A protein has these predicted regions:
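N-terminal, polar/charged subdomain of small-to-medium soluble alpha/beta proteins
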Residues: 1-85
Length: 85
């Protein structure tokens, strides 16, 4: 499953919190959907300490690059360092 691949690819971040929700059912039949799935990701990692939002998102998108757009059509990210909670 795509969820398992995403989790595996992001293990290097050693997240202390990780919540991945597949919301594809909410988007079935929408115009422009290439068949990939829609995900919301909430992740907390010390790896994000000192990095801004754009840098954090770039790290995640680079790790998942080969899954976009075939397996992942949309990905909403909420990224935090532990000290921000």
């Amino acid at each position: 499953m795509t969820e398992d691949i995403i989790k595996e690819r992001l293990l290097f971040l050693k997240p202390t919190q990780f919540n991945l929700e597949n919301e594809s059912e909410l988007h079935r039949g929408h115009k422009g959907n290439s068949g990939g799935e829609h995900f919301n990701l909430y992740i907390v990692s010390e790896f994000f300490e000192g990095k801004n939002t754009m840098e954090r998102h770039r790290i995640i998108y680079n790790a998942l690059e080969s899954l976009i757009p075939k397996k992942i059509h949309a990905l909403s990210l909420k990224t935090f360092a532990p000290k921000e909670l």
